Amino acid sequence: MNDIYVTGHRNPDTDAIVAAMAYANLRNALGDREYKAIRIGPINDETRSMLDRFGFEPPMFVKTMRTQISDIEFDTPPELNCGVSMDLAWRIMREGQIATIPIVRDDGTLHGMLSAGDIASYDMQTIYDAHIEALPVFNLLSVLEGQLVNEFGSNVETITGDVVLALPQTYGNPQLTEPSSIVICGDQPEIIDAALKAGVCCLIICQADVDAHLTDYDGGTCIISTPLDARRVGRLIFQAMPVEHVSKTGDIICFHLADYLDDVRELMLKSRYRCYPVLDENDHVVGTLSRFHLLRPKRKRVVLVDH
């Protein structure tokens, strides 16, 4: 972004090429800024022969000096993997004051964009829909600061079911005996025994000592203990879901480092997104761009030289 380009005239001859290379090398030797020799036209046979004779590569060809995204400053927020929990994503966005963050696949390509509004919208939906689909146990343990109690739980990768917050009067609740339920309880032996008897997929025990018979339990229930209270667990369990389930995907407007700012402005005027992902030549995410970055962009700086 801070490079200064040095070039001769169009349709350069040997003098123009050599002058650009010499001046760029001189300024780089002085060490004040980074200078790059370029050419804005095809190189002729005489110049190529001369460069080959002395072992020099011709300067890079630049077709136009129009400003590109690679020439300006843009945001470089941390990229989050698809499997990261919403709880961690929310904390990163809050601490870094980031409005929107890119979600990337394992190979670094874009999966989607996640905003604070996406997390809030999902959180509101969980009030009316307590179902959880394919929640990674690793995420759940991390968010709840929990530990696996029984050996069977270490073989479980994901859990699926309806979240049930067991109160004393919940003992007769039909959901408590559903194998697909995820039961949250405290130091309630009757509830624990009923849940294990029903074979619920997951039992989360809050702020209670774990009995030895639970450690040795080898049934089809993943048992987790946590130092958090049941109210917090009931909220955080939904925040353990991977961000890939709530991030915006599909028709995302992306820009590449080589895109020209004039073209970028036109596309931005036709849409109302807060920010846009910036990709490199391999479609890897390198940052985000917003309208703010286009207000006073830095232009390419050029030095024109000749003999």
Region annotations inferred by a language model:
Residues 28, 32-57:
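N-terminal beta-loop-helix "entrance" segment that forms/cooperates
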Residues 36, 60-61, 101-102, 182-185, ...:
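Short hydrophobic alpha-helical runs that function as membrane-insertion/retention elements
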Residues 72, 93, 101-119, 268, ...:
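A glycine-centered beta-loop-beta connector
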Residues 116-132, 234, 293-301:
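A short, polar/charged loop-to-alpha-helix boundary motif
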Residues 5, 62-92, 104, 110, ...:
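Bateman/CBS regulatory modules and CBS-like beta-alpha motifs in cytosolic regions of diverse proteins
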Residues 17-28, 189-196:
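Histidine-anchored nucleotide/phosphate-binding helix
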Residues 130, 215-248:
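Long, charge-dense
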Residues 12-18, 46:
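Short N-terminal binding/cap micro-motifs at the start of the first secondary-structure element
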